[in-house]
């Protein structure tokens, strides 16, 4: 580290003046030997006979002279601007600044890095003047390597973030039944019916109270257990209709003619189970591809013999797992919409496309063409708009119409998240899905 000595002409008048002297006004120009050190002073109106020198040690360069600090007790020229006066007064702090420059750096790694960088620049300049920079020795390679290593220590690069994998959650619309486990007799074994898109999150909200997002009717009446859930609705509107009819069986259009009442020896949950089975058999919901799931298997009850759920209703056990579908970013993961295998016309809109649920069948259809084909096979085209179940006209695979619509909505949802160039294309079937298991809640 080079040091600088600050001297004044007024202290040494006997000696001969330096060979070359330059008075600095404002910002000095760069000169060879100043080692890129700059000082800025506003001393345009100061006397030029009082100057100070900055003489680098062990150098043959011309000393740098700067104006000396005027006495603070003296008066400034009235024509001197205030900004210049401030800068002139601030020059009284010049000596401690130079002393700070002379202090060695606290970080030894920084010190060695700066010294090696300086030596490396000198070597490179010598070679350019000598042999034209032809080849580097092993010592120079080592200097370059140390230079890069130290530079990494001084300014480490930020870690690159991992590319975020785009996913969409498969739609889930469910209507559930809760049972109260309260110690108070007035609330014990009471039931509550609700709608949710995430049963595992919803039960925690109910047990957390209204502050956590629970319902008013479940606040301070728990803890609650989510015993069963009915899901597989094509959209949230159908699920909300099912919820309201389950909550109000005496006034709903689907069940008011039956006037369902709780029997004397029937538990509250057994009565709610009977209402759910009646709803699944009603004309409004019997053609949906629904699933009845027992979330707590120890609470399972036999279905009432008078109203067993329809044959196509699936029965499942265990907690619901979130299903995530990958949104691919490569061209080979998408297919063209192509033409309808029934009418032979091109499919122009993605929302009008449906496809077979078989993993090996590549057929695409218009939703209207496939529904009419299924209705004709079952002779239901007079009374219904869409079939309950049918077979694929290409491969013969059995399907439920609710599964066809659920796959169509998944394709549309992926198209809204993918790149713009793939929005009018169909994602492949064999792409991997991801399931998120629910976290077991501690009671």
Curated annotation (Swiss-Prot):
<dbReference type="GO" id="GO:0040019">
    <property type="term" value="P:positive regulation of embryonic development"/>
</dbReference>
<protein>
    <recommendedName>
        <fullName>Structure-specific endonuclease subunit SLX1 homolog</fullName>
        <ecNumber>3.1.-.-</ecNumber>
    </recommendedName>
</protein>
<dbReference type="InterPro" id="IPR013083">
    <property type="entry name" value="Znf_RING/FYVE/PHD"/>
</dbReference>
<dbReference type="InterPro" id="IPR000305">
    <property type="entry name" value="GIY-YIG_endonuc"/>
</dbReference>
<dbReference type="InterPro" id="IPR027520">
    <property type="entry name" value="Slx1"/>
</dbReference>
<keyword id="KW-0863">Zinc-finger</keyword>
<comment type="subunit">
    <text>Forms a heterodimer with him-18/slx-4.</text>
</comment>
<dbReference type="GO" id="GO:0033557">
    <property type="term" value="C:Slx1-Slx4 complex"/>
</dbReference>
<keyword id="KW-0233">DNA recombination</keyword>
<dbReference type="InterPro" id="IPR035901">
    <property type="entry name" value="GIY-YIG_endonuc_sf"/>
</dbReference>
<comment type="similarity">
    <text>Belongs to the SLX1 family.</text>
</comment>
<dbReference type="GO" id="GO:0009792">
    <property type="term" value="P:embryo development ending in birth or egg hatching"/>
</dbReference>
<dbReference type="GO" id="GO:0019899">
    <property type="term" value="F:enzyme binding"/>
</dbReference>
<dbReference type="InterPro" id="IPR001965">
    <property type="entry name" value="Znf_PHD"/>
</dbReference>
<dbReference type="GO" id="GO:0000706">
    <property type="term" value="P:meiotic DNA double-strand break processing"/>
</dbReference>
<dbReference type="InterPro" id="IPR050381">
    <property type="entry name" value="SLX1_endonuclease"/>
</dbReference>
<feature type="domain" description="GIY-YIG">
    <location>
        <begin position="171"/>
        <end position="258"/>
    </location>
</feature>
<dbReference type="GO" id="GO:0002164">
    <property type="term" value="P:larval development"/>
</dbReference>
<keyword id="KW-0378">Hydrolase</keyword>
<feature type="region of interest" description="Disordered">
    <location>
        <begin position="1"/>
        <end position="27"/>
    </location>
</feature>
<dbReference type="GO" id="GO:0000712">
    <property type="term" value="P:resolution of meiotic recombination intermediates"/>
</dbReference>
<keyword id="KW-0255">Endonuclease</keyword>
<keyword id="KW-0234">DNA repair</keyword>
<dbReference type="InterPro" id="IPR048749">
    <property type="entry name" value="SLX1_C"/>
</dbReference>
<keyword id="KW-0479">Metal-binding</keyword>
<dbReference type="GO" id="GO:0000724">
    <property type="term" value="P:double-strand break repair via homologous recombination"/>
</dbReference>
<dbReference type="GO" id="GO:0017108">
    <property type="term" value="F:5'-flap endonuclease activity"/>
</dbReference>
<feature type="zinc finger region" description="SLX1-type">
    <location>
        <begin position="340"/>
        <end position="395"/>
    </location>
</feature>
<dbReference type="Pfam" id="PF01541">
    <property type="entry name" value="GIY-YIG"/>
</dbReference>
<comment type="function">
    <text>Catalytic subunit of a heterodimeric structure-specific endonuclease that resolves DNA secondary structures generated during DNA repair and recombination. Has endonuclease activity towards branched DNA substrates, introducing single-strand cuts in duplex DNA close to junctions with ss-DNA (Potential). Has a preference for replication forks over 5' flap structures or Holliday junctions and shows much lower activity toward 3' flap structures. Required for proper crossover distribution through inhibition of crossover formation at the central region of chromosomes.</text>
</comment>
<keyword id="KW-0540">Nuclease</keyword>
<dbReference type="GO" id="GO:0008270">
    <property type="term" value="F:zinc ion binding"/>
</dbReference>
<keyword id="KW-0227">DNA damage</keyword>
<dbReference type="GO" id="GO:0036297">
    <property type="term" value="P:interstrand cross-link repair"/>
</dbReference>
<dbReference type="GO" id="GO:0051307">
    <property type="term" value="P:meiotic chromosome separation"/>
</dbReference>
<keyword id="KW-0862">Zinc</keyword>
<dbReference type="Pfam" id="PF21202">
    <property type="entry name" value="SLX1_C"/>
</dbReference>
<keyword id="KW-0539">Nucleus</keyword>
<dbReference type="GO" id="GO:0061064">
    <property type="term" value="P:negative regulation of nematode larval development"/>
</dbReference>
